[in-house]
Design a protein with these regions (language model features):
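Ligand-binding loop in jelly-roll beta-barrel domains
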Residues: 37-39, 75, 95-121
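A short, N-terminal "cap"/entry segment at the start of jelly-roll beta-barrel domains
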Residues: 1-42, 137-172
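Structural motif
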Residues: 27, 66, 73-75, 82, ...
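Tight coil/turn sites that cap or link beta-strands
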Residues: 51-52, 88, 96, 106
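Short acidic-glycine-tyrosine-enriched beta hairpin
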Residues: 14, 75, 80-98
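A contiguous, mid-protein "functional segment" used to position or interact
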Residues: 107-158
Length: 172
């Protein structure tokens, strides 16, 4: 991935030219991260597999997230409301509010996620590095690792707030 220079020249990221991250449960490509945008924003494209969980209920204290559904449908929990977000839907999930997402359908869902500021984009790489270091394999070990890394980044995860309709899609 080409980085912005000190003079912040425009940057175009071609299809497939982002950084692929082997994050548990997602096909993920980091298109721009905080290092390429001087910390302002990160853009991540992710595919949520059919009938799978995307992210557990969590609260960011330092970032806002924006989900734009490109293909398929995801369900988004925002505080106590659940929305079926089809292609073309934009969800603005601001800091300080609980949110989660999952794919209850039989087809993959693809989303473009913007995170501001962009420094949280490194979270995904941090999780993968910690998983490799610890050798975590089970769903419980992976979940515990994600929770630890999230906590270091001022993001709280609330596994007890998973909606009943999303529980069948949790990793086992």
């Amino acid at each position: 991935m080409k980085e912005f220079t000190a003079d912040r020249k425009p940057l175009v990221v071609a299809p497939g030219a982002g950084r692929h991250v082997d994050f548990p449960g997602h096909a993920m490509e980091v298109l721009l991260d905080g290092g390429t945008t001087t910390g302002n924003v990160a853009f991540v494209e992710l595919t949520v597999a059919p009938q799978s969980f995307g992210a557990p209920p969590h609260i960011h204290h330092d970032e806002d997230e924006y989900f734009y559904v490109l293909e398929g449908e995801v369900h988004i929990l925002s505080e106590n409301q659940i929305f079926a977000a089809q292609a073309g839907t934009l969800a603005a999930l601001t800091r300080g509010y609980l949110h989660a997402f999952w794919n209850a359908s039989n087809t993959p869902a693809r989303m473009l996620v913007a995170i501001a500021p962009g420094t949280f984009g490194g979270f995904f790489d941090d999780v993968v590095a910690q998983l490799r270091k610890s050798g975590a394999k089970t769903a419980a070990e992976v979940t515990a690792t994600i929770e630890q890394v999230a906590k270091r980044r001022n993001c709280e995860i609330y596994p007890d707030r998973v909606p009943d309709e999303a529980k069948p899609f949790l990793p086992r």
